[in-house]
């Protein structure tokens, strides 16, 4: 019986979540639909520098130092850029808090059960950094530990919605990424992000 249960759980882990009706069907990124746009996208004049050239020109980010210390995809933020990044993190956390989110500071490593709880495992195991000695995983997003705060918990309807926000460093192997989409600050192995997460009743509209 235990083997049958284990076999069934292994199969269930391969079944994805059911998307909402408004999610378009598609095989790749070309099927994505723009839901909302804001502001005006400027037309850059001929000869404009790419962001990675600007970062190097003004000594804001040093990619070579990151390679020296760790490897590609781990940039070193310097001076004004380091302060700007810190200010952005505080700004987004403060704005989320004003909108009713409770700030939490989760661990940056999770156990296997947490990875399974949010679907990173087993599907994306090859994209995660794994500390074999302790069988722990560096988080790819704060969504993983924050969601698992509520794993195996029964939440009463009158407790909803539950809104959390969290800042964290994020770690992704990005195996298979290459070309123009990995230049500069694109497709990094380590980056910072503010995550918002809401637990809502199924009858509430998604936002």
PLM feature spans:
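N-terminal alpha-helical targeting/anchoring segments
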Residues: 1-42, 60, 64
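TRNA-recognition modules of translation machinery and tRNA-sensing kinases, especially anticodon-binding
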Residues: 37-203, 207
